[in-house]
Amino acid sequence: YSEEDIDKVINETTTIIIPEELLTKLLRKGINKNAIITVEPNKNYMVQEIKFETISAYNTNKTFHPKENGWVGYIIIINGIRYYIAGDTDITEENKQVKCDVAFVPVGGTYTMDFKEAASLINEIKPKIAIPIHYGSIVGTEQDAIDFIRLLHPEIKGIILMKK
């Protein structure tokens, strides 16, 4: 959740999709409740002709992102292609069941899975493309992204989007 990023995209036509637990923060910020749709983990949704699923996103061995908060990652389906954006999470029973074509997974460690854990998850769920995220600003380094790509099975294409 980033108020800075919300400020960059909010306008009179913006719809914000968030877990229920974050609703109060957005309302306090002055965002119109009609512009907000709340979601729960592990459900299917259709908003403005965009189909998506939510997947629980939480830590299993640290306290930063507790499961009880109901935070989520998203699988967005566009033209039949399934894009998984994991969110801030560790490997969980829920995300080990994800079926996707493209996966965006955190590799920074500390608040999320590290690059080794992320590669393990990706090698298990087997998307066609895997893209490391959540590194290079708060925690994690570009080397984590490089090491993540190195650990992927050969049939999975790893792509680094953040470059210096």
Language-model regions: role of each:
Residues Y1, L23-L26, K43-M46, N61-K62, ...:
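Active-site environment of divalent metal-dependent phosphoester hydrolases
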Residues Y1-E12, E20-K25:
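Di-metal (Zn2+ and/or Mg2+/Mn2+) metal-binding site signature of metallo-dependent hydrolases
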Residues D5-I10, G73, N95, A118-I122, ...:
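Short amphipathic alpha-helical segments and helix-helix/interface helices
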Residues I10-I16, I81-Y83:
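Short active-site oxyanion
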Residues T15, G30-M46, A119, N123, ...:
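Binuclear metal-ion centers of metallo-dependent hydrolases, dominated by the metallo-beta-lactamase
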Residues I37-K99, M113, M162-K164:
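Core dinuclear metal-dependent hydrolase active-site scaffold
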Residues I75-K128, P132-G140:
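Metallo-beta-lactamase
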